[in-house]
Swiss-Prot record:
GO terms for cellular component: cytosol. Residues 2-159 form the Thioredoxin domain. Substrate binds at residue 122. Homodecamer. Pentamer of dimers that assemble into a ring structure. This is Peroxiredoxin. GO terms for molecular function: thioredoxin peroxidase activity. Its main location: cytoplasm.
Length: 217
């Protein structure tokens, strides 16, 4: 079962856009990707999710991030489902969908729960441009995902790469609003420097271990 911080496994997969090597394809392109599994094609909750992901596709692309769907259905089922969504809902699904028919990748990533049947649960894997798994979320089959949270998660992870942490509900935190947290000082010298920076107004803080600032682009 995959965990945060490890490399995404090297696999070659069949998708609605042809064969795809992960994470190699996106490492070479210098892109992040969000891999999300769904229980099955031609199901109501999954259909609403795919429409929602597609409507936010431009937001993900602005974050240098691509989308990939996955289920254990055949690629022919994926293709017909995408056609149905276009015909009935007038939404063109532009991202690829993996046909993991034998469930090899789904099992490797822990997307199938023995307590929830043989289909994949609603998993979300955020993988950065080095092929490292940065975040994992699991939802049960009966609960649709919050797409705004997935977008927020990618933004927060990319913000963390700039040396900051993000507070609860960022960028709408009750205490800090859109500001970001400076990681706590780990030695006395840095502690003193933080306190001085707060006095000068260079940064803000409640104490030496709880300092925050505006996000610098």
């Amino acid at each position: 079962m995959a965990v945060i911080g490890e490399k995404f496994p090297d696999v070659e997969l069949l998708t609605t856009h042809g064969k795809l090597k992960l994470p190699e394809h996106f490492i070479e392109a210098g892109k992040w990707f969000v891999l999300f599994s769904h229980p099955g094609d031609f199901t109501p909750v999954c259909t609403t999710e795919f429409v929602a992901f597609q409507k936010r596709y431009d937001q993900f692309r602005e974050l240098n991030t691509e989308l990939i769907g996955l289920s254990i259905d055949q690629v022919f089922s994926h293709i017909k489902w995408v056609e149905w969504i276009k015909e009935k809902l007038d939404v063109d699904i532009e991202f690829p969908i993996i046909a993991d028919e034998r469930g090899d990748l789904a099992v490797k990533l822990g997307m199938i729960s023995p307590f929830k049947g043989s289909n994949t649960v609603r998993a979300v894997f955020v993988v950065d441009a080095t092929g490292t798994i940065r975040a994992i979320i699991y939802y049960p089959q009966e609960v649709g995902r919050n797409m705004d949270e997935v977008v927020r998660l990618v933004k927060a992870l990319q913000t963390a790469d700039k040396g900051y942490a993000t507070p609860a509900d960022w960028p709408n935190n009750e205490l800090l609003k859109e500001k970001v947290i400076i990681p706590p000082a780990k030695d006395m010298k840095t502690r003193a420097e933080r306190l001085e920076a707060c006095k000068r107004g260079d940064i803000s803080g409640y104490d030496w271990w709880f300092c925050y600032t505006n996000l610098k682009e």
